[in-house]
């Protein structure tokens, strides 16, 4: 009986380790593709792109609540041009024993495009901003089709810097609204660009 129980425990531990390794491998591949296909940072400069170690605890299943009555508004950017968004919904989840709520946005400019009409935008700052990560915040992209049964997976290991992190004065990068200023440290995703 003990042997059967031990073999079952060993089997489940092996499956869990494989799943975690497989997840980390998939994120490593995602990040490699991100670096290799970067539209702003090219060639030798790509060695200045850095990331936190992949950590599964920063992949969360968030509760999603759609905001049906949201109005379009101008989100400030790093430049002179403001971009128009509306709040698509509210995400709720826990990281490091802290309940977090974030607003998820939809871009008016992208809604007219067949390719990008389902894109959702999650800009944020956190306790690492300006220390380990870009001072003005980072972004995560989601799709409306990612939301299932009022839940959506938010993977901070995929958090990336806006183009303004690499080149100043050229791009109009949305500034994360204060509702998405997190007090916790999100040690996942892209770090500060080291060429500056």
PLM region spans:
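Start-of-domain marker
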Residues: 21-72
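Acidic, glycine-rich flexible loop segments
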Residues: 121-163
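Mid-length scaffold segments of soluble, non-membrane domains
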Residues: 80-136
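Surface-exposed peri-terminal alpha-helical interaction modules
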Residues: 66-74, 82, 96, 142
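A structural detector for beta-sheet-dominated domains
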Residues: 52, 61-63, 94-96, 103-105, ...
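Bacterial Sec-dependent N-terminal signal peptides
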Residues: 1-22
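Extended, aromatic/histidine-rich regions of cofactor-dependent oxidoreductases associated
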Residues: 21-24, 28, 160-196
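Residues that act as N-cap/strand-start positions at coil-to-secondary-structure junctions
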Residues: 43-45, 54, 85-87, 134-136, ...
